[in-house]
């Protein structure tokens, strides 16, 4: 199947995101409230995670095994990442828009975060772990990277209890779109 990458990026740039429904039909979604991971002093994480970070058990990489991160994110009992969406992520990766931010323990993929980068916006699509704390360490290290690279926003799309522990917060759609417009003008790059 042919996909128009420019149209897909335009959809994300307008504040929408792709998801498959229970019948694997792909569609564009938006929400009245959007969840952001703070890139300032509001970002936080549990003290127990600081101990894990201090142990330096994990190393981080970008796009070392993009396909494995997509597969890890999609490998759930119920998933919104259909085969079609996995193919779109692969094409976005090949064209420089999709990234995997990974944690590794030795030669084993421990966890990762799948995201789309447009300007200074990191749009987090999904995350997973194979080794406990793998995705949490990825979150902390990704926020550090986004700060270093002067990103404007880390869009997590929808709130969940896991994200709340990192200081995630909701903003209204109008405020989100204003911030997104600013992010799109930023020359930030992940690599």
Swiss-Prot record:
It is found in: Cytoplasm. Its EC number is 2.3.2.6. One of its GO terms (biological process) is protein catabolic process. It is an enzyme of class 2 (transferase). Keywords: Acyltransferase, Cytoplasm, Transferase. It catalyses: N-terminal L-lysyl-[protein] + L-leucyl-tRNA(Leu) = N-terminal L-leucyl-L-lysyl-[protein] + tRNA(Leu) + H(+); N-terminal L-arginyl-[protein] + L-leucyl-tRNA(Leu) = N-terminal L-leucyl-L-arginyl-[protein] + tRNA(Leu) + H(+); L-phenylalanyl-tRNA(Phe) + an N-terminal L-alpha-aminoacyl-[protein] = an N-terminal L-phenylalanyl-L-alpha-aminoacyl-[protein] + tRNA(Phe). Gene3D superfamilies: Leucyl/phenylalanyl-tRNA-protein transferase, C-terminal domain. It comes from the Bacteria. One of its GO terms (cellular component) is cytoplasm. Belongs to the L/F-transferase family. Functions in the N-end rule pathway of protein degradation where it conjugates Leu, Phe and, less efficiently, Met from aminoacyl-tRNAs to the N-termini of proteins containing an N-terminal arginine or lysine. This is Leucyl/phenylalanyl-tRNA--protein transferase. It comes from Nostoc sp. (strain PCC 7120 / SAG 25.82 / UTEX 2576). The lineage of its organism: Bacteria, Bacillati, Cyanobacteriota, Cyanophyceae, Nostocales. The gene is aat.
